[in-house]
């Protein structure tokens, strides 16, 4: 069918055509190899922005540190990190004046959180720098290792399970003269394989004890490991991101809790809300500015971009902000919150894996670890790398670089938003004391500035004043990358505003399609994505119906489950045809079993099994939903699962979908090759931890417990719970006397074994 494309736009308002400008088909770029170069760039750039600051030496670690605070006022438009303490404090004071009681209330809310948070909060999150092994690990493993080391060094406050008590241990660990840790290492040896008679490398894993003196321990505790940010579109160069270790994480969490609580109360803040709630909040600010600028005033909006936001922020400024925000609070609370910025003022950046060299002629490859960069002859490197290394050398200690200024990506998003909003807040007429005034939106480093004034000169003056005020607190608006427009058209955090936020449905395109988890989850995720886009992104009924048909087609090709009566031949068609022929009610077969598709845009919210249940043959029902089916390793049956979907822009989003466990909810087995590497010991620890937690969850309904810490308490809790449950079941006649006696006997045996151990 030939369509004249101009017909598509006949009755469409211009802003709705945004979805046709979508540039992001295909895969985003991923980084390969080492991130060392990117990290060195970050460290060198950060120091360059603050180069006129004062140099000092950290007495504990011997690290050279640069402090740009209260440095020279800028005389040009170059980005700089010379924030002025008194200006930041004044901005905070005015913010409080405009929002009476905001800091007080947020402190009270945070204090409650601090006293209630369990240490398992730190198991959330992906890769975390594990200081005991000096590399990245899943968060739960890194936490378990840290606690294990703390306990073996006599730090036991963490046993209460409260995060605040774990942090007491962290503080105490920094005063210790030495810490003993267990590290994993691997031995390689060449042996002859009996079968093939070839030489093979055998690896064995060992654990060994190692003592760290105070200085080495402090360096590790203050280290942020770095990686390359993956899947960033629209950039030529990759960049580095940081993962902090367990010592820093807990403190950061509390600071961000406080800042989040403040952001929730600020109408200009684009955090912590998202999606439609965020759009509504932002639309209010725009509406306010437009209604106030009736006929007498002009109103312009800047779609803003800041130069290197976090490299010009400074932890010392955040310390000043926290000191002010918590000024009437109890001493212990002020101390807990000030530790994160203090640790960040003394942070060390781990430079990653180092450089890989290869000689084409001799077919040799060798890794130069970052520890060697301080001493290696620079003649082996190319010119740009040589310059980088020369610049960073004075900052190197044990393969990490001292990085006092700057914040590293994504650490204090909420708190830096508070700083940005405090400058937007100064735009009220009572503060500008002139004819122009401004307001705007801030979300981490992204901002939109709305300026109102009687004439163009006033607008220009307002923008200049805003620009200079920002400079005073270390925010550098980029004049090259920001643009100004009549209010009513601007972009903020990838939302495009034109007389209201425009639904840019094409941003969600990458998340349409088959996820590849398993047949059951993929079907559910696929229809949920379509449903969500109908709700949130103006996906119209006709387009949705088409998306659904394309999805089903895609799904059938992926899992080779074409309808039982189709002519298409695949590896599965023989079995599916047989099933089709012996099924009485063919409409009841799932799509993944060669059945027809019963979905349309009205019933996307119903899981397929429920949609077809009444139509299924009885024996098919019995096979499909049979927990005893030996071929299925069942996931836990939860009513809601989470899938990770990738929009074109911004971070991966978590999306909930209904999960009905059937024989199609299989889990692919893990790749076995990991078992031959040094990760093996860690993997076993992790599986052990998972097993314990899963077992524990069987005993306690999810409402009544928080994930435990420390094995000792878990066993006792499970035994006593088993006894109580058994007694109740016995008295109500649910179990027989013999079963009750057997349970009691098992419980006693477990306790006996623990006593012997």
UniProtKB/Swiss-Prot annotation:
**Top-rank lineage group of the source organism:** Viruses
* Cell compartment(s), UniProt: Host nucleus; Host cytoplasm
Post-translational modification remark: Phosphorylated by host PRKCA.
User: Where does the record place the RdRp catalytic domain?
Assistant: 286-483
Cite the Gene3D superfamilies for this sequence: 6.10.140.720
| Residue ranges, annotated region (Promoter-binding site) | 249-256
Gene Ontology annotations of biological process type: DNA-templated transcription; symbiont-mediated suppression of host gene expression; symbiont-mediated suppression of host mRNA transcription via inhibition of RNA polymerase II activity; viral RNA genome replication; viral transcription
Q: Where is this motif: Nuclear localization signal?
A: 187-195, 203-216
What is the reaction catalyzed? RNA(n) + a ribonucleoside 5'-triphosphate = RNA(n+1) + diphosphate
Q: Known Pfam families for this protein?
A: Flu_PB1 (PF00602)
Q: Polar residues bias located where?
A: 55-64
Give me the ranges of the annotated region Disordered.
Answer: 50-82
EC number, as in UniProt: 2.7.7.48
| GO cellular component terms, A-Z | host cell cytoplasm; host cell nucleus
Coiled coil segments of this chain? none
The record's keywords, sorted A to Z, are: Eukaryotic host gene expression shutoff by virus, Eukaryotic host transcription shutoff by virus, Host cytoplasm, Host gene expression shutoff by virus, Host nucleus, Host-virus interaction, Inhibition of host RNA polymerase II by virus, Nucleotide-binding, Nucleotidyltransferase, Phosphoprotein, RNA-directed RNA polymerase, Transferase, Viral RNA replication, Viral transcription
Its subunit composition reads:
Influenza RNA polymerase is composed of three subunits: PB1, PB2 and PA. Interacts (via N-terminus) with PA (via C-terminus). Interacts (via C-terminus) with PB2 (via N-terminus); this interaction is essential for transcription initiation.
Family per record? Belongs to the influenza viruses polymerase PB1 family.
Biological role stated in the UniProt entry: RNA-dependent RNA polymerase which is responsible for replication and transcription of virus RNA segments. The transcription of viral mRNAs occurs by a unique mechanism called cap-snatching. 5' methylated caps of cellular mRNAs are cleaved after 10-13 nucleotides by PA. In turn, these short capped RNAs are used as primers by PB1 for transcription of viral mRNAs. During virus replication, PB1 initiates RNA synthesis and copy vRNA into complementary RNA (cRNA) which in turn serves as a template for the production of more vRNAs.
Supply the name of the protein: RNA-directed RNA polymerase catalytic subunit
Q: What is the lineage of its organism?
A: Viruses, Riboviria, Orthornavirae, Negarnaviricota, Polyploviricotina
UniProt lists the gene as PB1
């Amino acid at each position: 069918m030939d369509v004249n494309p101009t017909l598509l736009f006949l009755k469409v308002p211009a802003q709705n055509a945004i979805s046709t400008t979508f540039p992001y088909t295909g895969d985003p770029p991923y980084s390969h190899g080492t991130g060392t170069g990117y990290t060195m760039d970050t460290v060198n750039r950060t120091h360059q922005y603050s180069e006129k600051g004062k140099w000092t030496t950290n007495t504990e670690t011997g690290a050279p540190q640069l402090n740009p605070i209260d440095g020279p006022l800028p005389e040009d438009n170059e980005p700089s990190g010379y924030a002025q303490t008194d200006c930041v404090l004044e901005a905070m004071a005015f913010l409080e004046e405009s929002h009476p009681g905001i800091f007080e209330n947020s402190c009270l809310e945070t204090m409650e959180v601090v006293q209630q948070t369990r240490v398992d909060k730190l198991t959330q999150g992906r890769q975390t720098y594990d200081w005991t092994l000096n590399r990245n690990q899943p968060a739960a493993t890194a936490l378990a290792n840290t606690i294990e080391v703390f306990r073996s060094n006599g730090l036991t406050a963490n046993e209460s399970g409260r995060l605040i008590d774990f942090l007491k241990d962290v503080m105490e660990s920094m005063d210790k003269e030495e810490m003993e840790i267990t590290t994993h290492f691997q031995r390689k040896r060449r042996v002859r394989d009996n079968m093939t008679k070839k030489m093979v490398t055998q690896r064995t894993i060992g654990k060994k004890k190692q003592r760290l003196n105070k200085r080495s321990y402090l360096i590790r505790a203050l280290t942020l490991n770095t990686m390359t940010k993956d899947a960033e579109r629209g950039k030529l160069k990759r960049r580095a991101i940081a993962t902090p270790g367990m010592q820093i994480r807990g403190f950061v969490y509390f600071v961000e809790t406080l800042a989040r609580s403040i952001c929730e109360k600020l109408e200009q803040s684009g955090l912590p809300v998202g999606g439609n709630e965020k759009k509504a909040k932002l639309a209010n600010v725009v509406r306010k500015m437009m209604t106030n600028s009736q006929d007498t005033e002009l109103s312009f909006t800047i779609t803003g971009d800041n130069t290197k936001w976090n490299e010009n922020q400074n932890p010392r400024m955040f310390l000043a902000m926290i000191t002010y925000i918590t000024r009437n609070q109890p001493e212990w609370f002020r101390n807990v919150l000030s530790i994160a910025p203090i640790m960040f003022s003394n942070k060390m950046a781990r430079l990653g894996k180092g450089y890989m060299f290869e000689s084409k002629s001799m077919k040799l490859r060798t890794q130069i670890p970052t520890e060697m960069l301080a001493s290696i002859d620079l003649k082996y490197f190319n010119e740009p790398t040589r310059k980088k290394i020369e610049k960073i050398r004075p900052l190197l200690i044990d393969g990490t670089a001292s990085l006092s200024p700057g914040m590293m990506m994504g650490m204090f998003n909420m708190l830096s938003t508070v700083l940005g909003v405090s400058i937007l807040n100064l735009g009220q007429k009572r503060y500008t004391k002139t004819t122009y005034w401004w307001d705007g939106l801030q979300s981490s480093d992204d901002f939109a500035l709305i300026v109102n004034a009687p004439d163009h000169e006033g607008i220009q003056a307002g923008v200049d004043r805003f620009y200079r005020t920002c400079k005073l607190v270390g925010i550098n608006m980029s004049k090259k990358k920001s643009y100004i427009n009549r209010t009513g058209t601007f972009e903020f955090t990838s939302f495009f505003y034109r007389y209201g936020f425009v639904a840019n449905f094409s941003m969600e395109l990458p998340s349409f399609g088959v996820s590849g988890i398993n047949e059951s989850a993929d079907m559910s995720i696929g229809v949920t994505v379509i449903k969500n886009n109908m709700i949130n992104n103006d996906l119209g009924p006709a387009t949705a119906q088409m998306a659904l048909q394309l999805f089903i087609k895609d799904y059938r090709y992926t899992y080779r489950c074409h309808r039982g009566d189709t002519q298409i031949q695949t590896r599965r068609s023989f079995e599916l045809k047989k099933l089709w022929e012996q099924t009485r009610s063919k409409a009841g077969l799932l799509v993944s079993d060669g059945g027809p598709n019963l979905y349309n845009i009205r019933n996307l919210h119903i899981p397929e099994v429920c949609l077809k249940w009444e139509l299924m043959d009885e024996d098919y029902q019995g096979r499909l939903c049979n927990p005893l089916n030996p071929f299925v390793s069942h996931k836990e049956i939860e009513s809601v699962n989470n899938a990770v979907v990738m929009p074109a822009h911004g971070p991966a989003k978590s999306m909930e979908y209904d999960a009905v466990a059937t024989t199609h909810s299989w889990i692919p087995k893990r790749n076995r090759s990991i078992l031959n590497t040094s990760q093996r010991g860690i993997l076993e620890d992790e599986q052990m931890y998972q097993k314990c937690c899963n077992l524990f969850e069987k005993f306690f309904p999810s409402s009544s417990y928080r994930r435990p810490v420390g094995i000792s308490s878990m066993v006792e809790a499970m035994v006593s719970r088993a006894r109580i449950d058994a007694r109740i079941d016995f008295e109500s006649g649910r179990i027989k006397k013999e079963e009750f006696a057997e349970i009691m006997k098992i419980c006693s045996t477990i306790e006996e074994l623990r006593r012997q151990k």
